[in-house]
Design a protein with these regions (language model features):
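Extracellular glycan-modifying ectodomains
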Residues: 1-384
Length: 384
């Protein structure tokens, strides 16, 4: 009888402590100001949604409020670290969509294409190319690390077959768009550091190998191996995949830039929508920030106009994602002007640019993962 009474008291005490702890966390969550950004994850955090009856009925409000609570929960970074530690002890090799590969190599999962968006994008690109019959239109899809560095994948990992996905896109685009294959060249160098260990981007070395493979299609002739010299600009880069997975946060990597050895490198970069100009393709101030990859062009912008002193008369329209940012410096000696558009941020249409900038060539340069989940290309390339 006495033992039963003691057990009930203990159970009640545990219940009271649990309720008080939960109540304390709720109070702290109300008092502590919301954070705008997670430095550890290198992303913006969800903000408190505005209440509207229509969004409540549709379920949109509940979804956004849940995301808000997940992002703004007090001690989130600490709990996240604890979860990663427990997962690793339990043998998990996949954390928040990131494979934890051999020798600490992090590899982002291969995205599955949204069939409707992909079909709309391909249709828009084909229609655009057919409407510009006198201008060469080229497509260069860059395979993601999980597709190339298959020797670094954890055992039993079975990512989507991105090679097959590329083949389907190439077939659907048909002859109206010239396909530039860089996958073969990157696979030849898979044992070299062509992708960062802690980030989803290729390294500048990987971009250079791709440039060498693409050069003949772009009308760039000769041996390019001795025409650029590399310089290290950072040895403390810790990329997005480390932030996303919570793994290898202490890993430090080198970022290199490649500079032409012979050509005149004078140029002007016009950040059209931002209303600013630069005489460099690099923004060294970004090396003091978390995402040091943004040293290339200062990060992503909606529209750039790069004017060079090249003797060439060619004017390139480059439609791209962030993989192109470290690729563009290889192109500048060979084009008089390069107009760079990122459809994720650009609100106009391509037809607005073709005549204004007297474009003579068009190149699409995307990583596979970005291309297969993109829902912006079809809008930007809508043929009027």
């Amino acid at each position: 009888m006495k033992k039963d009474r003691q057990r009930k008291v203990q159970e009640q005490l545990v219940g009271i402590i649990f309720i008080l702890t939960l109540f304390l966390f709720l109070i702290i969550n109300v008092i502590v100001p919301d954070r705008e950004k997670s430095v550890q994850e290198n992303r913006m955090l969800a903000t408190k949604p505005k209440f509207r009856l229509s969004s409540l009925i549709s379920g949109d409000y509940d979804e956004k409020f849940e995301a808000y609570m997940d992002d703004q929960f007090v001690g989130r970074d600490m709990w996240r670290k604890l979860k990663v530690t427990v997962d690793r002890i339990g043998g998990s090799r996949l954390e928040n969509g990131v494979y934890i590969g051999m020798n600490g190599q992090l590899l982002e999962q291969i995205e599955v294409a949204d069939e409707n968006h992909l079909a709309a994008n391909i249709k828009a690109i084909k229609s655009f190319s057919e409407s510009q019959s006198k201008i060469p239109v080229r497509m260069m899809l860059v395979p993601d690390a999980a597709n190339v560095l298959n020797h670094s994948l954890p055992s039993l990992a079975k990512p989507e077959d991105q090679t097959q996905m590329f083949s389907m896109v190439r077939k659907d685009l048909g002859d109206s768009v010239e396909w530039i294959d860089v996958s073969t060249e990157l696979n030849k160098h898979k044992t070299e550091k062509i992708y960062y260990k802690t980030d989803h981007h290729w390294t500048t070395l990987g971009a250079f190998y791709a440039f060498q493979a693409a050069a003949p299609s772009l009308g760039i002739e000769g041996d390019l191996s001795g025409k650029y010299v590399s310089y290290a600009v950072s040895d403390s880069f810790n990329g997005m995949l480390a932030s996303k997975s919570g793994v290898n946060l202490g890993e430090k990597e080198q970022i290199d830039i490649y500079v032409p050895t012979e050509e005149d490198t004078d140029l002007i970069v016009d950040y059209v929508d931002e209303g600013k100009r630069s005489t460099s393709l690099y923004d060294s101030s970004k090396l003091k920030e978390k995402d040091q990859y943004t040293v290339f062009l200062g990060g992503n912008s909606s529209l750039l106009d790069i004017r060079t002193v090249s003797t060439s008369t060619k004017r390139l329209l480059l439609v791209k994602d962030s993989f192109a940012n470290s690729f563009i410096p290889f192109l500048t000696p060979y084009y008089r002007e390069i107009v760079v558009v990122d459809p994720r941020y650009y609100s106009g249409t391509i037809n607005d640019l073709m005549d204004s900038y007297r474009i003579s060539e068009v190149l699409f340069l995307y990583s596979g993962n970005t291309f297969f989940k993109d829902n912006n290309i079809s809008g930007v390339f809508a043929v009027e």
